Amino acid sequence: MELAVGNLSEGNASWPEPPAPEPGPLFGIGVENFVTLVVFGLIFALGVLGNSLVITVLARSKPGKPRSTTNLFILNLSIADLAYLLFCIPFQATVYALPTWVLGAFICKFIHYFFTVSMLVSIFTLAAMSVDRYVAIVHSRRSSSLRVSRNALLGVGCIWALSIAMASPVAYHQGLFHPRASNQTFCWEQWPDPRHKKAYVVCTFVFGYLLPLLLICFCYAKVLNHLHKKLKNMSKKSEASKKKTAQTVLVVVVVFGISWLPHHIIHLWAEFGVFPLTPASFLFRITAHCLAYSNSSVNPIIYAFLSENFRKAYKQVFKCHIRKDSHLSDTKESKSRIDTPPSTNCTHV
């Protein structure tokens, strides 16, 4: 369930195209569309690089050593975000670059369906991570028996199954639309009964945004309250660490809310009100698009690169590659080194 941006907008009726923006066209697509494509490109490049690095670091676990539950959730989040960036953004960018849909019915269904699946997987994973941290800090005595890889993998499986099921109406109702007065083709949601779409939009907002956000806030509020009570018995180093955790938590909640709130506002507005078609609303929809897409790029920064341990492991990845490349070069120069194994003194997460 994604935002439509052509002369067809959210809803079940064909709306007239909004007034054209004042600036002239750039490369034949308009200044606003060109800027949007540039932003998409930056989000794509940053997100693919960041999520690929996260996956690489987390995949380098020591043999026989189980991954932590936190790392498993971060890995799942990065895989979902990377898949979304690779499979959705390049195709969705054609909406801004071309006046009509040219990618066929399957791609039309797939990218909008996977957009919703990825959105739900990300949100549910963030909620699962908040519960995981709550158990680890507030119920530390019982956490060792609950926070095990098997339970985390089971949670990941449930997250994907639930997301795939919740997004299925999008795959069913998304399709090609051919206006009678035009030879153009659009990729658009078509619901026979408007009441069903209203119900689905509300359910997606409640179960795919509001409740997970409330759960995240509840868990982190409990965590911060627990840490505040324990601060008196902590060393300065430990106190600084807990404050860092509190700052990260604040960033997590704020970014989560900001990234997806405009997306849901537009869908609710379109279904239960009259969404205006003006240059201002057009820019608002573009902003909502970019914010939703950027969430897949900022997650690696929030959950990985703010961690000192992760940064150290990230540096070790490059050190290991440098050592291995150096060893391969040495073996070519000296036959006496052919049987010498490469250095494996690398840190794993």
UniProtKB/Swiss-Prot annotation:
SMART domains: 7TM_GPCR_Srsx. GO terms for biological process: adenylate cyclase-activating G protein-coupled receptor signaling pathway; negative regulation of adenylate cyclase activity; neuropeptide signaling pathway; positive regulation of cortisol secretion; positive regulation of cytosolic calcium ion concentration; positive regulation of transcription by RNA polymerase II. GO terms for cellular component: membrane; plasma membrane. Palmitoylated on at least one of the three cysteine residues present in the C-terminal part. Disulfide bonds join 108-187. Its main location: membrane. It is found in: Cell membrane. PROSITE patterns: G_PROTEIN_RECEP_F1_1, G_PROTEIN_RECEP_F1_2. Residues 1-36, 92-109, 173-200, 270-271 are extracellular. A lipid is attached at residue 320 (S-palmitoyl cysteine). GO terms for molecular function: G protein-coupled peptide receptor activity; galanin receptor activity; neuropeptide binding; peptide hormone binding. Residues 58-70, 132-151, 222-248, 293-349 are cytoplasmic. SUPFAM superfamilies: Family A G protein-coupled receptor-like. The keyword Chloroplast does not apply. The chain crosses the membrane at residues 37-57, 71-91, 110-131, 152-172, 201-221, 249-269, 272-292. It is a multi-pass membrane protein. Interacts with GRP39 AND HTR1A. Belongs to the G-protein coupled receptor 1 family. Receptor for the hormone galanin. The activity of this receptor is mediated by G proteins that inhibit adenylate cyclase activity. This is Galanin receptor type 1. It comes from Homo sapiens. The gene is GALR1.
